[in-house]
């Protein structure tokens, strides 16, 4: 939250804090545990993007009067000139592409989002952030799931849902 506030201040745009803790727990964490309990591999990032970021967040932003929301996903949204449909496309930096975690987004959602980082490499993004003196320019990147400490799924499940851990054959 503090990084977002610093960036918003640097860009001179309003910053709002909305608590999605319960929604995240109910829609993402419970799903994650439930899928593991069923022996399936969950994709909590897809779930979070669909229900929290591009669901509740979009709804709240529109209610605050925003026309669109920009995120830091490395993907692109383009509107087809002939059909008017919005197309979700891979980010130009294929090493950082995140279009795969956005595949569930509908036309109604896509029309309200901008993904400006999808047109740049990670290196170029950092360079631009540095030139703009953004406080996150050199922040280490993360590849793991945001709520799993040290990317240790087993320890997380053992702590949060020990009843689902059963030895295999």
Show the residue positions of the predicted features:
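ATP-dependent adenylation/nucleotidyltransferase module used to activate substrates
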Residues: 1-103, 114, 124, 130
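Internal nucleotide-binding/catalytic subdomain
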Residues: 104-168
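Short polybasic amphipathic segments
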Residues: 88, 168-169
